[in-house]
Amino acid sequence: MITGRTALYGVVGHPVAHSRSPEMQNAAFAKLGVDAAYVALPVAPERIDEALRGAHALGFQGLNVTVPHKPRAASLCHALDPVATAVGAANTLRRTRDGWEGFNTDAPACRTLLEAAGVARGARALLVGAGGAARAAAWALLQLGTELRVAARREEAAAELCRDLAAAVPGADAATADFEDLEAEADAAAVVVNGTSVELPGHEGRLPPLRFRADQVVLDFVYGDTELARAARAGGARLVTGEQVLVRQGALAFTIWTGLPAPEADMARALEAREGAR
């Protein structure tokens, strides 16, 4: 039951109705008996500045930030953790007296999951996209010592990502790749990461059909039965799903907000229950 003492949290994005974070985080609060509620907050890109000020004024204790607001959210925080600083994007905000403190939990979540999938130092990695999620994945891949190649529809955005992350990660090997020849770039890579928002509700465009092999690792930030996930399974690749990324980053965010170990298994079950109800 929501009362006058219930702590408020939410996720801001555009669009955001598809987000599974409310089910996941509310399940975590319920499991641990935390008096809190988490809601989805649709915010158009041109209103993100006033939305974050308003959420702070309304007493929200923490926020998640999703497409397309992560880079802008980082610039609006009065303090950033080292990973958010390096990545240039924040997906988790914690309330302070002076405003918002920004964190990036996407990046360590990706690193943990990619490492568990067997990504090896020196492996060639193809990252598709150059937005906030892609920046987090780039940090993770460079931390793992991969040879990173970034392909984006806007080549200048891919080049900027490479420059920023190379400066932030000592010894980084990062360069752009040819988006127009994505099939060949993916075939040459041991690791392929989709950091774009294609196949999200409200987002147009598709990646070209890609084929994968059993010796490849594929990570898709978009959750659900995506074309990329189906292709990875068909080829026998080791697949890291968007759901896995969502749960891991969400668990890290939960701990940042509450100081409590996140009930990660319960959070994952909440996602599965929603998927089963669709």
UniProtKB/Swiss-Prot annotation:
It comes from the Bacteria. Transmembrane segments: none annotated. GO terms for molecular function: shikimate 3-dehydrogenase (NADP+) activity. It catalyses: shikimate + NADP(+) = 3-dehydroshikimate + NADPH + H(+). NADP(+) binds at residues 129-133, 221, 242. Pfam families: SDH_C, Shikimate_dh_N. Its EC number is 1.1.1.25. Shikimate binds at residues 19-21, 66, 91, 106, 223. Pathway: Metabolic intermediate biosynthesis; chorismate biosynthesis; chorismate from D-erythrose 4-phosphate and phosphoenolpyruvate: step 4/7. GO terms for biological process: amino acid biosynthetic process; aromatic amino acid family biosynthetic process; chorismate biosynthetic process; shikimate metabolic process. InterPro entries: Aminoacid_DH-like_N_sf, NAD(P)-bd_dom_sf, SDH_C, Shikimate_DH-bd_N, Shikimate_DH_fam. Keywords: Amino-acid biosynthesis, Aromatic amino acid biosynthesis, NADP, Oxidoreductase. The active site is at residue 70. Disulfide bonds: none annotated. Coiled coil: none annotated. Gene3D superfamilies: Leucine Dehydrogenase, chain A, domain 1, NAD(P)-binding Rossmann-like Domain. Homodimer. Belongs to the shikimate dehydrogenase family. Involved in the biosynthesis of the chorismate, which leads to the biosynthesis of aromatic amino acids. Catalyzes the reversible NADPH linked reduction of 3-dehydroshikimate (DHSA) to yield shikimate (SA). This is Shikimate dehydrogenase (NADP(+)). It comes from Anaeromyxobacter dehalogenans (strain 2CP-C).
